Design a protein with these regions (language model features):
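N-terminal Rossmann-like FAD-binding beta1-loop-alpha1 element of flavoenzymes
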Residues: 4-31, 316-320
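Short hydrophobic core segments
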Residues: 7-9, 32, 141-155
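Glycine-rich FAD pyrophosphate-binding loop
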Residues: 23-47
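Central helical "cap/lid" subdomain
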Residues: 39, 145-198, 258
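Short beta-strand to alpha-helix junction loop
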Residues: 58-64, 87-108, 238-244
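A conserved short coil-to-beta-strand element within the FAD-binding core of flavoproteins
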Residues: 117-131
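Active-site substrate-recognition segment that forms the wall
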Residues: 186-237, 247, 252-255
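Flavin (FAD/FMN) cofactor-binding core of flavoprotein oxidoreductases
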Residues: 246-247, 251-291
Length: 324
């Protein structure tokens, strides 16, 4: 049974940022991720010669701390500026993309981190002043502290399955957090799209909310677009999937002026936080006798890539101070 200072459940951006900062602070750590890859919504897909960003399409940098990291990434070639202005833009500032794709950001941060993939946390249990976590593969890990960076409903599921009782005010904060869902279609086109430069379009009042041209973006050699839908979870759950896909594709073709030759899909159940917590992280064991238990992610004071990064950054400092 492995023993570490901090177990991090979830290897999205918040998780890997926190992991690296804790490792730099000389803490022993272990990250676990139920998926087959790290990065969460910093995701990409390749098929039939096309390359797609499937989740987050770009990011901005406004916090000075984050700007310093982005500057280093630009210098090292990990990210590039995609664009800063476009017709009808309400503000002019750089929008960055990963190079070659968004997932490289998480991979770059996670280079030295111990990460177990395809490992789902089932229960956490208190063992005196420490935690014992049980996993779907029958492994167990002992840790002084736990950080959960999954979407909050998944974190709550782990906590409830474990019969861990939180302070009522903390639980109320967590229960308030909600997410919107998104159906993503990655489509190969029969010719280059007519989406205006720089290769993205945001759409209101349609079944489609966003289209990115991955060829114009510079990540796909052949014409390929990523389509994000305007759907809530119940609309998706109750729909005939093939009919839904065709409706989304037909709508997107009106904007791309090109026909879809082939496509693949992905449903983002927790695409973007609708209701967020006001703080960068949640100290879930506060006002209890529980060992250190923290939650972080893009639902904490910032629903974007930058928010996820800063949440992981600051929660790592809080955990380090807690364990000192």
């Amino acid at each position: 049974m492995r023993c570490v200072d901090v177990l991090i459940i979830g290897a999205g951006l918040s998780g890997v940022v926190a992991g690296k900062r804790l490792l730099d602070a000389r803490k022993t750590i272990q990250l676990v991720e139920k998926s087959a890859s790290i990065g969460g919504r910093l995701a990409n897909k390749r098929f039939d010669g096309a390359f797609f960003d499937t989740g987050a399409q770009f990011f901005t940098a406004k916090d000075p701390v984050f700007q310093n990291f982005v500057s280093d990434w630009v210098s090292s070639g990990v990210v590039k500026e995609w664009y800063s202005d476009y017709p009808g833009a309400l503000s002019v500032h750089p929008r960055y993309r990963g190079s070659p794709a968004m997932n490289i950001i998480a991979k770059n941060i996670a280079t030295r981190l111990p990460i177990k993939l395809k490992t789902k946390a089932l229960r956490i249990s208190r063992e005196g002043e420490i935690w014992k976590t049980s996993f779907s593969n029958d492994e167990e890990i002992i840790s002084k502290a736990i950080l959960i960076t999954t979407p909050v409903p998944q974190a709550i599921e782990i906590i409830d399955q474990s019969n861990v009782v939180l302070n009522k005010l903390v639980r109320k904060r967590l229960d308030k957090i909600s997410y919107e869902s998104c159906y993503a279609i990655m489509a190969i086109l029969d010719k280059p799209s007519k989406i205006p430069s720089p290769g993205s379009i945001s759409i209101a009042d349609d079944i489609v909310s966003w289209i990115s041209d991955n060829q114009q973006k510079g990540i796909s050699e052949i014409p390929a677009i990523t389509i994000h839908s305007n759907l809530d979870y119940l609309e998706y759950k109750n729909a005939d999937i093939k009919d839904l896909e065709q409706s989304i594709i037909e709508s997107a073709e009106k904007y791309s002026k090109a026909k879809v030759k082939s496509y693949q899909t992905h449903f983002w159940r927790y695409s973007k936080p609708l209701e967020q917590d006001a703080q960068r992280f949640v100290e879930a064991n506060i006002n209890t006798s529980l060992p250190p238990l923290f939650l972080a992610g893009d639902a904490m004071a910032g629903p974007r890539v930058e928010g996820a990064f800063m949440s992981g950054f600051y929660v790592a400092d809080a955990i380090t101070n807690n364990l000192s």
